[in-house]
Amino acid sequence: MRGGVLMDVEKIDAYTVRFQFEQPHGLFLKALASGRGYDMVDYPAHYLKHFHPTFTSKETLDVMTQAAGFDFWYQLWGDKRDWRNMNLPRLWAWTIAEPPPAQPVVFVRNPYYWKVDPDGNQLPYIDRINVEIYDPETINLKAINGEIGMQSRHLQFGNYPLFMENRDKGGYRVLHWINGAGGSNILGINLNQKDPVLKSIVGDRRFRIALSHAMDRDVLNEAGFFGIGRPRQVSPPPSSPYYDPAYEQAYITYDPVIADSLLDAMGLKQKNEEGIRIRPDGQPVEITIETTAFNSHLLELVAGYWTAVGVKTKVKELARQLFYQRKAALMHDVGVWGGADEQIPTLDPRWFMPYSHESIQAIGYSRWFRSDGAKGEKPPEDIQQVMALYRQIEESMDESEQIRLFQNILDLNRENLWVIGTVGGMPSLIVVKNTFRNVPEIALTGWSFRSPGNTAVECYAIEAID
């Protein structure tokens, strides 16, 4: 939808369609090339029309709906288009044969897949993929023991020495792919805080800049990433055409003196007997960092640094579902998550503006943005300025102009520091069995790329063992 009008799709021929919008949509092709492009092929009409009232009688739909255990036709329709439906026609290289809760979840070669290799052999090469679902600790142990064909997610960087030491024993190799994210352990201070006094405090840029200067990122880098990473804010990585070294390095110097002076200047000079600063209402300045076991030992270090400058901080680990529930209800003080796709930040600018429910620093403002002001909380002028710049980016068909406009967004982020970065620049670790072939030595990772989906996984192969 552009300009409040749904797009128009025109069929040109059996293989060509034309998309028309009310206003220019400069990010449309990039979105199609990203994970969002799946939506274009997720609704096979010849199958799903049997479960839609436009094409099937109400009587027939009612019978099918009740037989499937649903109350409404749209519940049946949603169930039939779910990726776990084994009967749903797919263009994927593999189709699902045993969906969750099966263990393992099984995908099998799609005999109708549309790609062939240079010799005319139909792809994919691999006939069957077993996806075993475990907790992160078990995943890491299995990877170290060589019990996984390939693993790219949930590998804990703290296990890096073990991954490297056990390569020969486990019969695997460790690839170091380029990380397209802007950092790890990103701290999103809730600007839509429900406590009005705390909201006023965290809404002051001096508070956020003070907390940034209060952290020793070199210690965080050594403790969590063996010094391999680089202290930085949440900025596009050096491999990105949007890279901005000025924002990357803003306020990252460890300097508690600067932190103290900024907090004093805010009027938070008075402290209690524990050295914790006193709010205007007489209460101590206290915040909680909420995380989903995202390098909690590093966050305990962060809490110590912040407490040392008079902002009492504790860390709370939550189950992912509860974490999401609390942030949706704007109940968190500080939420922690990793980078997204800062390589191409225009596709998902969650860390540069209140863009979506993943913009943990200002979900209330993101609701205002997504609803054109109908919902959520109206943001201050500087954030509205960022939103207006992004709307201009959406309407520009010139990537150089998109980069120029986004630089203005980065400038405003550098000035305001709406989110606080810690460390970034670590490679994405990929553990691959030695019998697993055609996996590139170097690739770019990112959520929008659906990595490793951007590495021609249909060409992966398993070497025969005599």
Functional labels for PLM-detected ranges:
Residues 17-19, 92-95, 103-107, 126-133, ...:
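Short, well-ordered beta-strand elements
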